[in-house]
C-alpha cells in the first residue's frame, strides 16, 4: 500500500531514545527543555515563549484556557478545520462560529473571516491548510485592528512562512502537532506558543496541574519545605516528556531534508498531472509564501471523486479528504451556508505525500490517478453506449 502519510524514523531516533533510557529519566526533564529551545530557534522566538506538550490537541485546548474563553464568547474558525479546534472552543462553553474558505486554497480569506465576526467574537482560530500560509498577514492585521486574539493552528505548517516570518508567530497564540502522521513526528506531541511571555508562563503552569513549580528539585532551590505545593490555576497534566522530546530534536534536525523532498514530490505531481482532464492542481503560492507541503490536493468533478478514490484504493494507493466541513458535522450543525467549503468537500482529494515516496511511486500514483479519472469520465460520457 502506498500510504497517504508516513513518518521517516531511523537509527538517529533509536540512538536518541537509547540515551534517554541510559539517563534513567524518561519524564519531563532536560531534553524537553532542549527541544523547546531548538524549536523556538526554528521559529525565531524566545524559548520562554514555547511549551512542549503531549499532543497538538492539548495545545489547542490550552489556548482556550489561557485566554479564559467561556460562555458568551464567540470564536471564528474556518469550517474546513480539524475537529479538535472546534472541540477545544466548545469545551470551554464558548461558541465556534464557522466561516467559509477560498474554494481552491481551502484557507479562509480576510473577507470570509470578517463576514463571520459577531459582537461576541473574542478570537479567531486560523488553520494553514495543507501547509499553505493563506492570508495570515492580512488576517493578523485585521485581528489587531479589531482587538481580537488570533490563534494559529499550525499543525500543517511546521516549516511554512511568509517573507521569512514563521507561520504560528503572526498571531497571539499558536499550536503545532507532532503526531505519527505529521511532518515532524514524536509519536504523540505538540507545541504551544504565546507572543506574550506571561501567557506562555501561565500555559506552562496550566499544563502541569496549575502548579507554579514543576518538581521538588525546583522547589528546593527556593524553599526548605520543597514538598509543599503552590497551586495558581486549575490545570491538567498536558506536559511532554524526554522520550518524545528526544525524538523531536532529531526530527527537527532532519526537517529541511523532509521539506525539500516534499517540495520535490509536489513539483513532480504538478508536472505529471498537468494534462489530466478536468482536474485542478493546488494553486500557485504567492511570492514570499513558503509551504510545508503537508497535503497535495487535487480537485475534480464531485460525480467521480469518490469512485476515483475507490479505484486507487483497489490499486493499492490510499487517498483521502481533509477536512469535512465542521458546520455539517451533527454535533456542530450550524444554521449557515458556506458554499465554498461545501463545494471543496465534494471535489477535493489528497494524494500520497511523504518523504518515503520514491520517484517510481510518485509516477505510479500519478499514472493510476490519471487512469482512474479518465475511466470514470468516459463512464459518464453521454456518448457511452
From Swiss-Prot:
Keywords: Aminotransferase, Pyridoxal phosphate, Transferase. This is dTDP-4-dehydro-2,3,6-trideoxy-D-glucose 4-aminotransferase. One of its GO terms (biological process) is polysaccharide biosynthetic process. The gene is spnR. Belongs to the DegT/DnrJ/EryC1 family. Homodimer. It comes from Saccharopolyspora spinosa. The keyword Transferase applies. It catalyses: dTDP-4-amino-2,3,4,6-tetradeoxy-alpha-D-erythro-hexopyranose + 2-oxoglutarate = dTDP-4-dehydro-2,3,6-trideoxy-alpha-D-hexopyranose + L-glutamate.
Amino acid at each position: 500500500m502506498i500510504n497517504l502519510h508516513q513518518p521517516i524514523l531511523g537509527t538517529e531516533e533509536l540512538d536518541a531514545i537509547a540515551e534517554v533510557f541510559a539517563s534513567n529519566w524518561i519524564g519531563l526533564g532536560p531534553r524537553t527543555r532542549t527541544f523547546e529551545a531548538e524549536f523556538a530557534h526554528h521559529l525565531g522566538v524566545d524559548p520562554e515563549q514555547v511549551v512542549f506538550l503531549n499532543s497538538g490537541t492539548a495545545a489547542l485546548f490550552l489556548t482556550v484556557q489561557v485566554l479564559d474563553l467561556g460562555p458568551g464568547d464567540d470564536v471564528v474558525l474556518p469550517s474546513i478545520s480539524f475537529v479538535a479546534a472546534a472541540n477545544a472552543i466548545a469545551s470551554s462553553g464558548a461558541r465556534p462560529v464557522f466561516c467559509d474558505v477560498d474554494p481552491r486554497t481551502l484557507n479562509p480569506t480576510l473577507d470570509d473571516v470578517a463576514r463571520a465576526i459577531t459582537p461576541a467574537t473574542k478570537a479567531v482560530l486560523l488553520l494553514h491548510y495543507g501547509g499553505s500560509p493563506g492570508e495570515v498577514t492580512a488576517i493578523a492585521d485585521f485581528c489587531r485592528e479589531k482587538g481580537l486574539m488570533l490563534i494559529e493552528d499550525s499543525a500543517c505548517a511546521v516549516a511554512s512562512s511568509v517573507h521569512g516570518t514563521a507561520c504560528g508567530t503572526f498571531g497571539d497564540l499558536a499550536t503545532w502537532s507532532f503526531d505519527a502522521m505529521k511532518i515532524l513526528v514524536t509519536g504523540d506531541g505538540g507545541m504551544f506558543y504565546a507572543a506574550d511571555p506571561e501567557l506562555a508562563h501561565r500555559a506552562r503552569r496550566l499544563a502541569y496541574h496549575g502548579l507554579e513549580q514543576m518538581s521538588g528539585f525546583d522547589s528546593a532551590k527556593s524553599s526548605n519545605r520543597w514538598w509543599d505545593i503552590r497551586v495558581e490555576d486549575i490545570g491538567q497534566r498536558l506536559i511532554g516528556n524526554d522520550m518524545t522530546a528526544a525524538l523531536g530534536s532529531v526530527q527537527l534536525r532532519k526537517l529541511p531534508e523532509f521539506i525539500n523532498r516534499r517540495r520535490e514530490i509536489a513539483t513532480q505531481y504538478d508536472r505529471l498531472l498537468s494534462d489530466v482532464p478536468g482536474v485542478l492542481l493546488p494553486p500557485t503560492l504567492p511570492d514570499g509564501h513558503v509551504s510545508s507541503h503537508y497535503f497535495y490536493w487535487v480537485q475534480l468533478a464531485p460525480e467521480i471523486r469518490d469512485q476515483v478514490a475507490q479505484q486507487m484504493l483497489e490499486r493499492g494507493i490510499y487517498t483521502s479528504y481533509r477536512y469535512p466541513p465542521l458546520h455539517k458535522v451533527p454535533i456542530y450543525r450550524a444554521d449557515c451556508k458556506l458554499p465554498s467549503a461545501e463545494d471543496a468537500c465534494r471535489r477535493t482529494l489528497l494524494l500520497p505525500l511523504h518523504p518515503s515516496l520514491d520517484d517510481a511511486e510518485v509516477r505510479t500514483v500519478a499514472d493510476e490517478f490519471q487512469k482512474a479519472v479518465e475511466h470514470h469520465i468516459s463512464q459518464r460520457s453521454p456518448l457511452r453506449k
